[in-house]
Amino acid sequence: MVEDTPDDLVHELFTESFWRGHALGRPILGTKETVESFSREALRDYFTDTYSAPNLIVAAVGNIEHERVKDLVAHAFEGLPRTSRPVTEEPPVVVPHTMVRNKELEQSHVCLGTSGYQQDHTDRYVSYVLNTILGGSMSSRLFQNVREKRGLAYSVFSGLSAYRDTGSMTIYAGCANDAVGELIDVVVAELRRLKEEALPEPELRRAKDHLKGSLMLNLESTSSRMSHLARQEIYFDRQFGLDDTLAGVERVTADDMQRVAHDLFADGSLGATVLGAVNGLKISRDRLSLG
């Protein structure tokens, strides 16, 4: 099904290339070959090893009584195994690759990316603000310079993916087949500019306010609060309030932004995947240079 949604497919292809040889690079749905190879015994063994008491976190929010929820959980899951197989997966080693896949499409889909930070990294708040400025809103640099100023793409944005021991920052854009080269050049120029030029204070203020507003809106629904609690337990082994997160965002300085931009956008760190009718397109490492 992902083959029919090229904007999803280009992300899957990028991920496969970026995390090459690691579990993070495998497609979530699997492949036809892997799914066909599943046996009843393999599924049962995986379920038994994975869905065990040490691996279980239950998050609940709303008009509830804590002790009542504890009793319900204890009763419902009392039959779960009390031990589990330890996870020994090593953090991935990223070697950025360039990939071009020809596919007859009305437009090309481009995904660029660098390594990012894990969930509990001390500079995670800086990366949140950096992403907001780069491509996280309609006032972001990519939206303004790629779409509004040059008309190269209708959809362009950046995003962060953070895991327990690694992460990534990706940039996506859909553009005309003959505009891929110019699009990549503009994105690379924006990444370099974040490294080389001090961030104006008004732009930093706008990004902080936008990010804080988004964080507050995201926690208005009970389902979002529930997911937020679960993530905190998974990655931090504790709970902390929205005020702590907002304070972390507010502490970010322009110097922090430039320092983290140098860290994330180091020369040689940028990978690229292009999907579309781009026969003969070549993307050299020099073109992706962030030095």
Predicted regions and their residues:
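A conserved active-site cap/scaffold subdomain adjacent to cofactor or substrate pockets
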Residues: 126-136, 142
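Phosphate-proximal small/polar/acidic motifs at interfaces that engage nucleotide phosphates
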Residues: 88, 143-144
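Charge-rich, well-structured scaffold segments of protease-associated domains
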Residues: 1-84, 100-101, 105, 111, ...
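Active-site cores that bind ATP or allylic diphosphates and position pyrophosphate for catalysis
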Residues: 93, 146
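Double-stranded RNA-binding/processing signature
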Residues: 91-92, 124
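Long, charged amphipathic helices and adjacent flexible linkers at domain junctions
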Residues: 87-89, 95
